A protein has these predicted regions:
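Conserved pre-motif I regulatory segment
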Residues: 1-41
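Short acidic active-site motifs
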Residues: 25, 97-101, 124-125
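Walker A/P-loop
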Residues: 32-52, 63-68
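Loop/turn-to-beta-strand initiation segments
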Residues: 35, 60-63, 85, 109-113, ...
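Conserved Walker A/P-loop ATP-binding site and its immediately adjacent core
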Residues: 47-48, 56, 60-93, 97, ...
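Conserved motor-coupling elements within RecA-like helicase/translocase cores
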Residues: 99-112
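SF2 helicase catalytic motif II
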Residues: 111, 121, 125-153
Length: 153
């Protein structure tokens, strides 16, 4: 299976010459606007899959729900180093910072917005997201739902 030109271009912008074989099908699936779940080992390149597709559709927003702050900071920094317009909202951000970030989002100035799961409990955040042109919502580290989430016993 081959990749479309816009995906190859996005992959190159992220610093990769070609995808791993196991990345191609999920990239093409997401690119077509379909849902996908990728279950793979740490270090296998799951992040590259959604970042490539999100970047290829940079006219729309990709929201990444990431429970681990260290990963948010690392991924945001890496994307910024590759010239990608990205920001994040977590509990360390002031209301003023969040308002500025959401303003950038509404103006279409961000390709990626990383948020922590608790942000989804914010009525104002959900309301702001309802009126945006969102291409993709990614749940990274989804195994943590069962590790840290609400469990009925």
């Amino acid at each position: 299976m081959d990749m479309k030109r816009h995906l190859k271009s996005a992959l190159k912008q992220l610093g990769f010459d070609k995808p791993r074989k196991a990345q191609i099908i999920p990239m093409n699936t997401l690119d077509a606007g379909q849902d996908a779940i990728v279950i793979a080992a740490t270090g296998s390149g799951k992040q590259v899959i959604y970042e490539t597709v999100g970047l290829a559709h940079s006219d729309k927003l990709t929201i990444v729900i990431e429970p681990l702050l260290a990963l948010i900071y690392n991924q945001v920094q890496t994307l910024q180093e590759h010239g990608v317009s990205v920001d994040y909202i977590d509990m360390t951000r002031s209301k003023e910072d969040i308002d500025k970030i959401l303003h950038k989002v509404r103006k279409g100035k961000l390709n990626f917005l990383y948020v922590t799961p608790e942000r989804l409990q914010s009525h104002s955040f959900i309301e702001a997201m309802q009126h945006l042109d969102v291409f993709m919502v990614v749940i990274d580290e989804c195994h943590s739902i069962t590790e840290w989430g609400y469990n009925v016993s």
